């Protein structure tokens, strides 16, 4: 069986683990400028302190988009989760927001089977400013063709088994979109499975190359691409094998595939 690697830091015992292993954060990138990525959020779990475990994106003043494997497959207690809006450095003057509801996609049970997407409803809407505001969702017709240069952001590890060091700055890396069929072929290299078995599914999007990728702790965070002058969220950090390895692009949940589901809960206008 393909050894798949989760991108989330260990969190709830309810997280689906087998047959999955951990993966690792932003590789090959740099610290993000303080005025960029105003939709980036950090999800926190209450341990000895409110610890970062996944990323997410603000898509509405009261809604956060993230990966289902961060909080599922069963619905986690929202009282055990907090959201920190865009911060340059983790744990520096935190202002954590309460969550009223966590909604995982009903067909999710493991990352490699797709539907790795979830919504968090905040108890109160946030105040929108130049520093904090939602990212735009793409139109259903947007395909993000192969070679499109996009950006992924997060506070995850900076290499395999290498944690992001203090002061834990938000990192960014530019990654090219890889066409699904090519990505699937890449993932079949060195894997003993039939060519008729699709590892990369239609609801997934691939991006990254050797030396440039997302990693552990980045799960749930946004992959964004600038289209006609507007930043659109193309994907949600989901899974991969290793970190920035040859023939192993990062795999993201394709946002356009789940627009109808998202808008069952999240208003289109605000």
Swiss-Prot record:
GO terms of biological process kind: proteolysis
Record PROSITE patterns: TRYPSIN_DOM, TRYPSIN_HIS, TRYPSIN_SER
Annotated GO MF terms: serine-type endopeptidase activity
Coiled-coil parts of chain: none
A Pfam family that the UniProt record links to this protein: Trypsin
Enzymatic class: hydrolase
Keywords per UniProt: Disulfide bond, Glycoprotein, Hydrolase, Protease, Serine protease, Signal
Disulphide-bridged cysteine pairs: 54-70, 150-225, 183-206, 215-243
Residues bearing attached sugar chains per UniProt: 46, 127, 228
Domain (Peptidase S1): residue spans on this chain: 26-267
Domain of life assignment: Eukaryota
Positions of the catalytic residues: 69, 116, 219
Enzymatic reactions: Preferential cleavage: Arg-|-Xaa, Lys-|-Xaa, but with more restricted specificity than trypsin
EC nos: 3.4.21.59
Segment forming the signal sequence: 1-25
InterPro entries referenced in this protein's UniProt entry, alphabetically: Peptidase_S1_PA, Peptidase_S1_PA_chymotrypsin, Peptidase_S1A, Trypsin_dom, TRYPSIN_HIS, TRYPSIN_SER
Membership in a protein family: Belongs to the peptidase S1 family. Tryptase subfamily.
Full protein name: Mast cell tryptase
């Amino acid at each position: 069986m393909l050894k798949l690697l989760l991108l989330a830091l260990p969190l709830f015992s309810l997280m689906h683990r087998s047959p999955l292993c951990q993966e690792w954060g932003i590789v090959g990138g740099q610290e993000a400028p303080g005025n960029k990525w105003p939709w980036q959020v950090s999800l926190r779990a209450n341990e000895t302190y409110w610890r970062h475990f996944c990323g997410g994106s603000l898509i509405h003043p009261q809604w956060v988009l993230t990966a289902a494997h961060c909080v599922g497959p069963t619905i986690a207690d929202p009282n055990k989760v907090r959201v920190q809006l865009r911060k340059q450095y983790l744990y520096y003057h935190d202002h954590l927001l309460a969550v009223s509801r966590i909604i995982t996609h009903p067909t999710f049970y493991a990352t490699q089977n797709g539907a790795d997407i979830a919504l968090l409803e905040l108890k109160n809407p946030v105040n929108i400013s130049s520093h904090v505001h939602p990212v735009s969702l793409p139109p259903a017709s947007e395909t993000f063709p192969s070679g499109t240069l996009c950006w992924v952001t997060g506070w995850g590890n900076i290499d395999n088994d290498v944690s992001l060091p203090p002061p834990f700055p938000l990192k960014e890396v530019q990654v090219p979109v890889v066409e699904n069929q090519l990505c699937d072929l890449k993932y079949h290299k060195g894997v003993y499975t039939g060519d008729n078995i699709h590892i990369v599914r239609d609801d997934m999007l691939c991006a990254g190359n050797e030396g440039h990728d997302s990693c552990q702790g980045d799960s749930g965070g946004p992959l964004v691409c600038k289209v006609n002058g507007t930043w659109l969220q193309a994907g949600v950090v989901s899974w991969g094998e290793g970190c920035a390895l040859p023939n192993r692009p990062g795999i993201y949940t394709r946002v356009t595939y789940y627009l109808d589901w998202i808008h069952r809960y999240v208003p289109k206008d605000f």
